[in-house]
C-alpha cells in the first residue's frame, strides 16, 4: 500500500486524462497535493505556472501532481480540471478534501504540499513558492 493511502483513505483511484489510475501507480514518485479552486484568482494565476513546470519536469524528476479541489460544484470542478495535465482526487471525495485540509493545515489556496508517495512523509509545505523561485527545479524536491 502506498504511503499516500493514509492521507486518501477513501480513494483507491485518481482521475487522469485517460480515465482513472490507482494510488499504487504513484509508487516511487514525489507527489504534489495541489489545493486549488476555479473561483480563486491566485489559483487561476498559479495553475499555468505549475502546468509549465509539470510539462517540463514531471518525467525527469519523477513527480506527479494531484488536484485537491475546493470547488463546491461538480461542473466547476470538471471545467477547471479540464485545463490541467495532471491527476485529481475525484469530486465525490469531498470528505477526504476536508480531512486533507485539516491534516496539512491548509487555510488558503493555492497551496502545494510535497509528499513521498512510498512513505507518506511530508517533504515540504512551501512548494508553490519554490516552483516560482526555482522554475528549473534545480533544488527539487525542496525539503522544508
Curated annotation (Swiss-Prot):
Cysteine pairs bridged by disulfides in the record: 40-43
MF-aspect GO terms: thioredoxin-disulfide reductase (NADPH) activity
Keywords attached to this entry: Disulfide bond, Electron transport, Redox-active center, Transport
Ranges for domain Thioredoxin: 2-144
InterPro entries for the chain: Thioredoxin-like_fold (IPR012336), Thioredoxin-like_sf (IPR036249), Thioredoxin_CS (IPR017937), Thioredoxin_domain (IPR013766), TryX_NRX_thioredoxin_dom (IPR045870)
Keyword Metal-binding recorded: no
Cellular component GO terms, alphabetical: nucleus
GO BP: any one term: negative regulation of Wnt signaling pathway
Pfam families hit by this protein: Thioredoxin_8
Family: Belongs to the thioredoxin family.
Protein purpose: Acts as a thiol-disulfide oxidoreductase. It is spontaneously reduced by trypanothione.
Protein's name according to its UniProt entry: Tryparedoxin
Amino acid at each position: 500500500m502506498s504511503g499516500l493511502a493514509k492521507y486518501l483513505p477513501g480513494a483507491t483511484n485518481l482521475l487522469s486524462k485517460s480515465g482513472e489510475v490507482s494510488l499504487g501507480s504513484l509508487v516511487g514518485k514525489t507527489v504534489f497535493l495541489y489545493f486549488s479552486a476555479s473561483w480563486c484568482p491566485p489559483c487561476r494565476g498559479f495553475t499555468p505556472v505549475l502546468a509549465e513546470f509539470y510539462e517540463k519536469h514531471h518525467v525527469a524528476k519523477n513527480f506527479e501532481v494531484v488536484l485537491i479541489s475546493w470547488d463546491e460544484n461538480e461542473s466547476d470542478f470538471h471545467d477547471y480540471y479540464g485545463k490541467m495535465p495532471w491527476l485529481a482526487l475525484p469530486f465525490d471525495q469531498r470528505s477526504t478534501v476536508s480531512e486533507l485540509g485539516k491534516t496539512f493545515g491548509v487555510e488558503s489556496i493555492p497551496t502545494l504540499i510535497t509528499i513521498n508517495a512510498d512513505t507518506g512523509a511530508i517533504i515540504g509545505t512551501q512548494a508553490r513558492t519554490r516552483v516560482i523561485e526555482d522554475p528549473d527545479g534545480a533544488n527539487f524536491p525542496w525539503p522544508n
